[in-house]
């Protein structure tokens, strides 16, 4: 049985790691195409975002603005988390909202774990209880390539 934890480890964590390495190793202004690839924002979308915001180059701050506005799964998670000011403790409702998961599987996972709130460190336990088939996320047996 594949779980949301499998998806998170294969799809989201490598993307976060690649962004972290990029931001630590590259100096702004950042290359627009690389940023688009990292955030999985199609070129037409990021070009439109840059034009709407009248941005000619990407700094660290603009990188995160683009991340909030992008439509990729990670961008959506980032946007929803920042809307909630990156909570220290997560209720099932907050987990479902941030990670775009159906509420019932998250509530079931919380009941199975006997917890009402979760720290960042506890999220993998919650994710491991949510069957991927219950989510909207596809799973590929081919690992994500790290850019």
For the regions a protein language model found, what residue spans apply to each?
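Helix-turn-helix DNA-binding helix
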Residues: 46-47, 106
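Short alpha-helical "recognition helix" segments of helix-turn-helix
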Residues: 34-36, 95-96
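Short helix-start
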Residues: 50-85, 114-147
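Short helix-capping/hinge SLiMs at alpha-helix to coil transitions
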Residues: 24-26, 84-86
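DNA-contacting interfaces and partner/effector-binding or oligomerization modules
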Residues: 1-11
